[in-house]
């Protein structure tokens, strides 16, 4: 995006205005607010910033090329997304914070050493790092709102076993809209300025419920037990999710930490990816959060978006079958070339936006580096060796703009190491995580009064002219 010097200075002034308003909203607080109160305090500043930006509606921020239209709108700046910004060179930043910043600053659970995804949700929504006490209270609220209506249990029982887990998850999430406060309030009549509040309530309800729904999909023979299982309100969102999956207890503490890290890392990755954009698109029609995120889940179910982790695992296991556990660098290099020469891609490498190594991949590798049992796993050793050799092979092959590993190159293999060996379910876990970012933006869409999304289309003859 090319901006004039004047526009840059003006943007700087807008940012200063927002920071000043945010500072003023905090100045008179004497007690730690809950999440809704914290959000309510920052909405006026954000609305003022939005108003000032809207006054510049006629300014040009870029150009549209034919490649943008026929290439999936890749690289086209065309939607507002507050929680995160994905830089091709630096990777993802959450309100300006890197993953390492978040790992250092965001509160941890009562056990484990990894940041909590509910703390990430707080940061994404408010731009503020919550205190440990604030996150503990939020975790408690999520546990207390996790119960499901009976019709959801009955619905999941009715699904044929042949139905894909993502189909089940999306249907169940959509069916939860019987609980929507936004839908009920809108039907009765609701001021546009107040749309955000029942949207917030629905979003928290969905965050609280989606781990249990996901666990029911994972454990279809135990719907009645898992559907009514009491959660530990003193524990965090990921801990209770692991309990629902049947992986509780001290013997699974490392898995709990992996789950915390995974859910936090996958929660938001800007707004242009399919699951985030689909949620925003459907939400722009004022569909409630349950219906909106159900649409996002259907996008996530597509093999080009959410299935990469299981494809990596399948490919790595096939690689191990071929070259064994006592492999050489040449064995790995030759297998990579065999994959490419057969017309296939190397799964877990490259990215639609990133042009440098994915910092989420590095975060997972750092996690593994502190676990001797992971480092000793022959399957993980292949992941590590691939990350050392594949970039040079892919660069020589010459058909990728980013030869580096992405987060999927490690996530499925780590799940597999900890006994979570049902690859079809990896995307369901992704779906639990990805709820964080799109729901945050949906709340802000309502708070800022964003309109329904309605781009203009063009046909091939029009482009040819």
Curated annotation (Swiss-Prot):
Transit peptide stretch: 1-29
Subcellular location, record wording: Mitochondrion matrix
Disruption phenotype: Leads to attenuated virulence in a mouse model for pulmonary infection and an infection model based on embryonated eggs.
Predominant place of localization: mitochondrion
Residues bound to oxaloacetate: 269, 351, 360, 434, 454
Pathway(s) where this gene product acts: Organic acid metabolism; propanoate degradation
Keyword set includes NADP: no
One GO CC annotation: mitochondrial matrix
Binding site for CoA: 74, 192, 304, 346, 348-349, 400-401, 406
Active-site residues annotated for this sequence: 305, 351, 408
EC number(s) stated in the UniProt entry for this protein: 2.3.3.5, 2.3.3.16
Keyword match GTP-binding: no
Pfam family, one: Citrate_synt
Inducing factors: Expression is induced by peptone and during infection.
Function in brief: Component of the methylcitrate cycle that catalyzes the synthesis of (2S,3S)-2-methylcitrate from propionyl-CoA and oxaloacetate. Plays an important role in detoxification of propionyl-CoA, an inhibitor of both primary and secondary metabolism. Also has citrate synthase activity using as substrates acetyl-CoA and oxaloacetate. Plays a key role in the estabishment of invasive pulmonary aspergillosis.
Matching PANTHER family: CITRATE SYNTHASE (PTHR11739), CITRATE SYNTHASE 3, MITOCHONDRIAL (PTHR11739:SF15)
Family: Belongs to the citrate synthase family.
Protein name in UniProt: 2-methylcitrate synthase, mitochondrial
Lineage per the UniProt record: Eukaryota, Fungi, Dikarya, Ascomycota, Pezizomycotina
């Amino acid at each position: 995006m090319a901006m004039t010097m004047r526009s840059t200075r003006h943007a700087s002034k807008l940012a200063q205005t927002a920071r000043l308003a945010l500072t003023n909203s905090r100045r008179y607080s004497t007690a730690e607010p809950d999440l809704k109160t914290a959000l309510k305090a920052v909405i006026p500043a954000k609305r003022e910033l939005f108003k000032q930006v809207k006054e510049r509606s006629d300014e040009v921020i870029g150009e549209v090329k034919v490649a943008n239209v026929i290439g999936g709108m890749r690289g086209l700046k065309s939607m507002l997304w507050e929680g995160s910004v994905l830089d091709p060179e630096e990777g993802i930043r959450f309100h300006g914070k890197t993953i390492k910043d978040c790992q250092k600053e965001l509160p941890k659970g009562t056990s484990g050493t990894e940041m909590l995804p509910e703390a990430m949700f707080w940061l994404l929504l408010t731009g503020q790092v919550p205190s440990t006490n604030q996150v503990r209270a939020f975790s408690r609220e999520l546990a207390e709102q996790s119960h499901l209506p009976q019709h959801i249990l009955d619905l999941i029982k009715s699904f044929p076993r042949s139905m894909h887990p993502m189909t089940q998850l999306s249907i169940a999430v959509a069916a939860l809209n019987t609980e929507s406060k936004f839908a009920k309030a809108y039907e009765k009549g609701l001021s546009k300025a107040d749309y955000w509040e029942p949207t917030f309530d629905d979003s928290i309800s969905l965050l609280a419920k989606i781990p249990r729904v996901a666990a029911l999909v994972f454990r279809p023979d135990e719907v009645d037990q898992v559907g009514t299982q009491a959660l530990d309100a003193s524990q965090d969102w990921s801990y209770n999710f692991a309990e629902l999956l049947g992986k509780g207890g001290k013997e699974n503490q490392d898995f709990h930490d992996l789950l915390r890290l995974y859910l936090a890392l996958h929660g938001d990755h800007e707004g242009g990816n399919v699951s985030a954009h689909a949620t925003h698109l459907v939400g722009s029609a004022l569909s409630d959060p349950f219906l909106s995120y159900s649409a996002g889940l259907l996008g996530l179910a597509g093999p080009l978006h959410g299935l990469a982790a299981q494809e990596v695992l399948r490919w790595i296991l096939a690689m191990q079958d071929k070259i064994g556990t006592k492999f050489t660098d040449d064995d790995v290099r030759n297998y990579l070339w065999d994959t490419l020469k057969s017309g296939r891609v190397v799964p877990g490498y490259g990215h639609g936006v990133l042009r440098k190594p994915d910092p989420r991949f590095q975060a997972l590798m750092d996690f593994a580096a502190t676990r001797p049992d992971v480092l000793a796993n022959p399957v993980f050793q292949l992941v590590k060796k691939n990350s050392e050799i594949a970039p040079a092979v892919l660069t020589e092959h010459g058909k990728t703009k980013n030869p580096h590993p992405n987060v999927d190159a490690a996530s499925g293999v780590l799940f597999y190491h900890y006994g979570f060996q049902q690859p079809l379910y990896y995307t369901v876990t992704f779906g639990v995580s990805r709820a964080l970012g799109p729901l945050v933006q949906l709340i802000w869409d309502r708070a800022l009064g964003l309109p329904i999304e309605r781009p203009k289309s063009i046909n091939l003859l029009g482009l040819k002219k």
